[in-house]
Amino acid sequence: MTGKLVERVHAINWNRLLDAKDLQVWERLTGNFWLPEKIPLSNDLASWQTLSSTEQQTTIRVFTGLTLLDTAQATVGAVAMIDDAVTPHEEAVLTNMAFMESVHAKSYSSIFSTLCSTKQIDDAFDWSEQNPYLQRKAQIIVDYYRGDDALKRKASSVMLESFLFYSGFYLPMYWSSRGKLTNTADLIRLIIRDEAVHGYYIGYKCQRGLADLTDAERADHREYTCELLHTLYANEIDYAHDLYDELGWTDDVLPYMRYNANKALANLGYQPAFDRDTCQVNPAVRAALDPGAGENHDFFSGSGSSYVMGTHQPTTDTDWDF
C-alpha cells in the first residue's frame, strides 16, 4: 500500500447539526422518495397511439434530452459538489441528490421501454449526441462542475435544476393538460418536485458561501451568474425552436422558460432577469403542474405524484366492539 492513511475518520452524527437546513432538506427528500416502477405507465399506451409521428418524435427527443441532463447531474454535478460540502450532513444530502438524479434518468428509460420501439429509442439517443444545442448546454454546465470554483459549481447546478430542465418539462405538462400521457406526466411531476428541492437547497448553500466573501467578490459572482444565465438562455431559445417549431409550440414554451430562469435567480438570492409580463405561463400548463392534478392511483396499481404512503396501526379485538 502506498500513500498515507487519513489520521481520523469521522462518523456522521445527525444529533449534532451544524446547519439545521441539512436535516430539513434530508427529511423532505427522503419523505419524497419514489421509484418509476410504481407508476403505471402502460396506462398511457392508448393515448400515445393517438399522437402523430412528429408528436411522438418530439416527445421522445425531449425525454432523451432530459435523460442526458440528469445523467450529467448524477455522475458529475452532485458528486463534484460533495467535496465542497461544509458539513457532513450536507455531504449526505448531496449523495441522496445524486442517487435521485440517477432515478430520474432511469425513469425516462421506463417511459421509453413502455411506449416506444427500439428504433425510436436508438434514433433519439443518436440525436442527443448530435444536437448542438443540447450538447452545448450540457458542456457549459459540466465545464463549471469540473472547475475549481465551488460557488460557480453551485450556481451552475441551480441553473440546471431550476431552469434548463424546464424547456423539456413543458411538454408532458402540455400533454397532461389535454388529457394525454397523464401517467407519464405524473412521473414528471415527481421529478419536478425533487428538482425544486434540489434547486432551493443548492441555492441556499451558495448564498451561505457568498456571505463569507467581500463585497467585490460577491459583485463578481453576481456578474458571472447573470452572464451564465443569458448564455444559457440564448442557447435554450435555439433548443426550443429546434424541438418545438414544427409543432408550433415554441411561443408557448419561451415564457415558461423565462419564468423558471427567474426562479433560478431567486434561488440564488438575485433579482429576476425577465419582466413579469414576459413570463406568463399558459394557464393550462400551470394547472397541470399542480401535484393535485396527478393521477391518484390505488394502493396496488401504483403511486402518483399526489400519492400518500399508506400507514397502519395495530388493533385488537376490542377495537371492533361498537
Swiss-Prot record:
Record-linked Pfam families: Ribonuc_red_sm
Entry binding sites for Fe cation 1: 70, 101, 104
InterPro entries hit by this protein: Ferritin-like_SF (IPR009078), RNR-like (IPR012348), RNR_NrdF-like (IPR026494), RNR_small (IPR033909), RNR_small_AS (IPR030475), RNR_small_fam (IPR000358)
Catalyzed reaction equations: a 2'-deoxyribonucleoside 5'-diphosphate + [thioredoxin]-disulfide + H2O = a ribonucleoside 5'-diphosphate + [thioredoxin]-dithiol
Any single GO BP term: deoxyribonucleotide biosynthetic process
Upregulating conditions: Expressed in growing cells (at protein level). Transcription not induced under oxygen-limiting conditions.
CDD domains for the chain: RNRR2 (cd01049)
Cofactor: Fe cation
EC number, UniProt record: 1.17.4.1
Domain of life per record: Bacteria
One cellular component term from this protein's GO annotations in UniProt: ribonucleoside-diphosphate reductase complex
Binding site for Fe cation 2: 101, 161, 195, 198
Name of this protein: Ribonucleoside-diphosphate reductase subunit beta nrdF1
Organism, scientific name: Mycobacterium tuberculosis (strain ATCC 25618 / H37Rv)
